[in-house]
């Protein structure tokens, strides 16, 4: 085909103005026309020139408009990234000009839902042709060739597509369909990507919450009896006065533990207490609490009475009622959780002269409470600990005691220190969180380290997070090797 053929005075209404790059600077409109006319009649070629030079010199690129859309697309398919012109090092770059994006296919393509499965492409074209020229119509079909009851059609202009939506959306119910016809703009690639990422994020958050909650229920087995009894007495009948015994240990934070509780949250915490109590083989701590107004008497009874929790793991099935607890307790304020942290400090000072076994038991008990709080209230617990830990832990490389330092591999590329900190803080107090960055590319190496202040938290994190899936990969979480080893992991 050449430029001497008969053709209209103007290009077709759906023609495309194309940008062409990687053109020899020595080429004029004549050489370019000879190249492109083999694909169709050329309406116009405009070589971009540097006007600051005299005479103006080609910039090595141009705009070209064919008389037909078909010719432009054929030229693009044959030349773009395919043909290298004389004297050039890279192949031709050919794509619609920026001005053509206003008429992109995605802006003119419609999705048609609730289509009768008896309809074919011609039926759809006939139904919508009243609104303008249709470039393409396609019925979605399954592997068996049967219609899926939906279709795509592409008009030559966006205004035609808009008229079709206005006139046809839910205007009729087709044969064999339970709802009126659906006519809307088809999802763009960007829309599809956003939906996919949103769904993936929701799934990951659900998995993370589930892992935090059920992976740490074993921590309830280490709760000292007085904590379970205190929780049960506190929440039953909305009686909050029993928390007054915590004031000497937690100060104003003990009040904060109750200020955010409503009736529904109290009821669910009572469910927790009842379920946890079912896992115990002794009621002595509960009676000790009921007859005592001093926290020291509770601690004394804890230290002198044996706590037989060895068989409690067999009763963990009774904790199934906790599944809805995380959502129901969403109204707890950050001060409530801060009270738990303050409680730990108060207990430590109150027991400075206590026996080693008593202090160890209470340390385990607090660890269980801390992990349960993270499981039941992941979002708020994270907020509280971010304010307490985030300033010092994120980005630092301090090490915790032996057995409390973790190596994490297969992290998402976009994860930073704060993301790593937030993911692992539900399992205990974090000393440091560090994602390693490639100094050359300034990109994450997809691994990092977490250090807790105790080995119990590290083991809880391994149990819940090792193998946890994020995107297409699963986290690898393991103890960091000793300094004496040749490799840190």
UniProtKB/Swiss-Prot annotation:
PTM description: Phosphorylated during oocyte maturation and dephosphorylated following egg activation. Dephosphorylation is calcium dependent and correlates with the increase in the activity of EDEN-dependent deadenylation.
Record keywords: Activator, Cytoplasm, mRNA processing, mRNA splicing, Nucleus, Repeat, RNA-binding
Family of the protein in this entry: Belongs to the CELF/BRUNOL family.
UniProt GO cellular component terms: cytoplasm; nucleus; ribonucleoprotein complex
Domain remark in the UniProt entry: The 2 N-terminal RRMs and a part of the linker region (between RRM2 and RRM3) are necessary for binding to EDEN of mos mRNA.
Keyword presence, Hydrolase: no
Function: RNA-binding protein implicated in the regulation of several post-transcriptional events. May be involved in pre-mRNA alternative splicing, mRNA translation activation and stability. Mediates the rapid and sequence-specific cytoplasmic deadenylation of EDEN-containing maternal mRNAs following fertilization. Binds to AU-rich sequences (AREs) of jun mRNA. Binds to the embryonic deadenylation element (EDEN) motif localized in the 3'-UTR of maternal mRNAs. Binds to RNA containing several repeats of the consensus sequence 5'-UGU-3'.
Residues annotated as domain RRM: 16-99, 108-188, 404-482
Pfam families: RRM_1 (PF00076)
Subunit description: Oligomer. Oligomerization is required for RNA-binding and EDEN-dependent deadenylation.
Listed name of the protein: CUGBP Elav-like family member 1-B
Molecular function GO labels: mRNA 3'-UTR binding
KW Repeat (keyword) present: yes
GO biological processes: mRNA splice site recognition; regulation of alternative mRNA splicing, via spliceosome
Subcellular location(s) per record: Nucleus; Cytoplasm
Classification via CDD domains: RRM1_CELF1_2_Bruno (cd12631), RRM2_CELF1_2 (cd12634), RRM3_CELF1_2 (cd12638)
């Amino acid at each position: 085909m050449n430029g001497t053929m008969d053709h209209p005075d103007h290009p077709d209404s759906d023609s495309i103005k194309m940008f062409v790059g990687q053109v020899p600077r020595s080429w004029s409109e004549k050489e370019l026309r000879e190249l492109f006319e083999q694909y169709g009649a050329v309406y116009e070629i405009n070589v971009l020139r540097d006007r600051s030079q005299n005479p103006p010199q080609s910039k090595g690129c141009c705009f070209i408009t064919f008389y037909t859309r078909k010719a432009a697309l054929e030229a693009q398919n044959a030349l773009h990234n395919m043909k290298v012109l004389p004297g050039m090092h890279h192949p031709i770059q050919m794509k619609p000009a920026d001005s053509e994006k206003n008429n992109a296919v995605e802006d003119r393509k419609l999705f048609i839902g609730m289509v009768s499965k008896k309809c074919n492409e011609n039926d759809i074209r006939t139904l919508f042709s009243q609104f303008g020229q249709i470039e393409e119509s396609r019925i979605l079909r399954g592997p068996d060739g049967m219609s899926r009851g939906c279709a795509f059609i592409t008009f030559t202009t966006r205004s035609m597509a808009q008229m079709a939506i206005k006139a046809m959306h839910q205007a009729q119910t087709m044969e064999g369909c339970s709802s009126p016809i659906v006519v809307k703009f088809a999802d763009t690639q960007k829309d599809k990507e956003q939906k996919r990422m949103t769904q993936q994020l929701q799934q990951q958050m659900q998995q993370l919450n589930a892992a935090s909650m059920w992976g740490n229920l074993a921590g309830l087995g280490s709760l000292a009896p007085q904590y379970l009894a205190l929780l049960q007495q506190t929440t039953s009948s909305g009686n909050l006065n029993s928390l007054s015994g915590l004031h000497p240990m937690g100060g104003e934070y003990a009040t904060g533990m109750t200020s955010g509780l409503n009736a529904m949250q109290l009821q669910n915490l009572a469910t927790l207490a009842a379920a946890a109590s079912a896992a115990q083989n002794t009621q002595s701590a509960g009676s000790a609490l009921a007859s005592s107004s001093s926290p020291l008497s509770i601690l004394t009874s804890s230290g002198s009475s044996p706590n037989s929790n060895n068989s409690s793991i067999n009763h963990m099935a009774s904790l199934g009622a906790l599944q809805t607890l995380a959502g129901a307790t969403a109204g707890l304020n950050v001060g409530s959780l801060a009270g738990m942290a303050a409680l730990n400090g108060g207990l430590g000072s109150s027991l400075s002269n206590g026996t080693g076994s008593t202090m160890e038991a209470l340390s385990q008990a607090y660890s269980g409470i801390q992990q349960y709080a993270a499981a039941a209230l992941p979002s708020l617990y994270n907020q509280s600990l971010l304010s307490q830990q985030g300033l010092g832990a994120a980005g630092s490389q301090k090490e915790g005691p032996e057995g409390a330092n973790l190596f994490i591999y297969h992290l998402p590329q976009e994860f930073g220190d704060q993301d790593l900190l937030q993911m692992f803080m539900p399992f205990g107090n974090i000393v440091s969180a560090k994602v390693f960055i490639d100094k050359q590319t300034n990109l994450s190496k997809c691994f990092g380290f977490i250090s807790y202040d105790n080995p119990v938290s590290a083991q809880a994190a391994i149990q819940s997070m090792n193998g946890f899936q994020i995107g297409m990969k699963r986290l690898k979480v393991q103890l960091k090797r000793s300094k004496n080893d040749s490799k840190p992991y």
